[in-house]
Amino acid sequence: MMTSKINYYIDLKRFDYKKCLDIQYRLVSMRKNDLIGNTIIFVEHDPVYTIGRKADPRNYSNVNVIRTDRGGDITYHGPGQLVSYFIFDVRINGKKEVKTFLNNIENVYINLLKNLGYSASTGDEPGIWIEKNGKLKKVASIGMAIDDYVSYHGVALNINKEVLNGFIKINPCGLPPAVMDYIDIKRDDAIDLIIREIEKIYGKFNKIEYEGLIS
């Protein structure tokens, strides 16, 4: 949906998962009421395991989890991972186009990875995959939700080897932990590349502090 509101992105740096979820809910309400434009939250969480609506307990028998309303199964968030939450109006000409929106987000990450020299694609399983040492490896997990016509939750991109330790205790999205991998990129560089790709689809995004957005 076209809006006169300015698109923004927020960088919360290192931030608690539950507190960030509360921020998402607040921004979703604001987006539904057209008080803000499309908004992205960038964040790195303290170590945490979260489960989505399709979670299978057999995939996380040895860890404490936070239950969420996103799609998907269990995943891990922690240092070495850049999480992007997309608070977007998914309507096109007044019609809710969830599939188009999801394809757009997937293509942002596929193009980002291709620009870094990786052969990237979606696969039979959710997420973004690259070919590494002759094997397909998952470097980004996707889990979204839609409230009426506004998206929330998002994409977790592994950007440092440190994050892989968090997947050892679970079957992420029902898969063996060995499928998870990472790309070696600085956090700020990854944000810049995501913004560059998203602006090709949704127009200009300006950086803002969270307090400035809700004031």
UniProtKB/Swiss-Prot annotation:
Q: Name the residues annotated as site: Lowers pKa of active site Cys.
A: K138
InterPro entries associated with the record: aa-tRNA-synth_II/BPL/LPL, BPL_LPL_catalytic, Octanoyltransferase, Octanoyltransferase_CS
Q: Which GO terms describe its biological process?
A: protein modification process
Q: Name one Pfam family in it.
A: LplA-B_cat
Q: Start and end of every BPL/LPL catalytic domain? A: 34-215
Task: Tell me which residues bind substrate.
Answer: R70, G71, G72, D73, I74, T75, Y76, H77, S141, I142, G143, G154, V155, A156
Catalysed reactions, semicolon-separated: octanoyl-[ACP] + L-lysyl-[protein] = N(6)-octanoyl-L-lysyl-[protein] + holo-[ACP] + H(+)
Q: What is its EC number?
A: 2.3.1.181
Return the SUPFAM superfamilies for the record: Class II aaRS and biotin synthetases (SSF55681)
Q: In which pathway does it act?
A: Protein modification; protein lipoylation via endogenous pathway; protein N(6)-(lipoyl)lysine from octanoyl-[acyl-carrier-protein]: step 1/2
Tell me where on the tree of life, at the top rank, the source sits: Archaea
Keywords for the protein's UniProt record, in alphabetical order? Acyltransferase, Cytoplasm, Transferase
Catalytic residues (UniProt): C173 (acyl-thioester intermediate)
Q: Which GO terms describe its cellular component?
A: cytoplasm
Question: What is the top EC class of this enzyme, as a single word?
Answer: transferase
PROSITE patterns assigned: BPL_LPL_CATALYTIC (PS51733), LIPB (PS01313)
Q: Offer an example of a GO molecular function term for this protein.
A: lipoyl(octanoyl) transferase activity
> According to its UniProt record, where is this protein located?
Cytoplasm
Q: Which family does it belong to?
A: Belongs to the LipB family.
Instruction: Report the protein's function.
Output: Catalyzes the transfer of endogenously produced octanoic acid from octanoyl-acyl-carrier-protein onto the lipoyl domains of lipoate-dependent enzymes. Lipoyl-ACP can also act as a substrate although octanoyl-ACP is likely to be the physiological substrate.
- Additional free-text comment from the UniProt record: In the reaction, the free carboxyl group of octanoic acid is attached via an amide linkage to the epsilon-amino group of a specific lysine residue of lipoyl domains of lipoate-dependent enzymes.
Name used for this protein in its record: Probable octanoyltransferase 1
Q: Which organism is it from?
A: Picrophilus torridus (strain ATCC 700027 / DSM 9790 / JCM 10055 / NBRC 100828 / KAW 2/3)
